[in-house]
Amino acid sequence: NSLYHNNDEYWMNFIKFSKHMTLSRAVRCLTIMGRTEKDQLSLSQYLYPSMQAVDIKELDLDIVHAGTDQRKVHMLVREVFPKMKWKVPVAVHHHLIPGLANTGGASDTTFTKMSKSNPKNSIFIHDSEEEISSKIKIAWCPEGISDNNPILEYCKYLMFHDSDSFTIERPSKFGGDMLFSTYEELESEYKNGKIHPLDLKLSVGRELNDIISPIRAYFSNKSELFSSI
């Protein structure tokens, strides 16, 4: 990466920025790597918050847009950059959509977010309809459990984001379709065992494909744009 290789200015800025940090502050920022203060960390991992901060400087960013797991390092940036007379970026954070695998009871999505290093645990904008369906079908979605349930998270933050209703399609022999006008209503019915996980998954898979389909089509014949992201 040209940002780091043969770039003396970058590493000089790295040292300057690090002088404004304490070790305890660096540890608190390490959740951006999916780590906690309780984990045994290598020395190199303690360097990461400073590197991410200096990346913002080197890329001359006006806005940093990321998940809520990165808010600590971005708050550090907004605190330290003025002292160094560097341009202070606007920080915009959003809810993290969790990965599709079993979270093991983890309550912090920092540890369960989607990652490109595990394709089966993630939905990508270039996934085909078949890939989306396959991933959703094997996703962790315990019957009657809403906590840390990735399929219900999709419903809450994606299905209901741009729509005021969500339909679960079911064969008439299993009670027919179910229409929900709020996420809370859907969650309640699921927790009460009124919705089978497979019915929920199939409907979420269809909705996800509808969301991703135009994006997938746009990039299908623009490989140079796709490779850039």
Stretches found by the model and what they are:
Residues 53, 59, 71-229:
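Conserved nucleotide- and phosphate/pyrophosphate-binding catalytic cores
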Residues 1-93:
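Divalent-metal (Mg2+/Mn2+/Ca2+)-assisted nucleotide/phosphate chemistry catalytic cores
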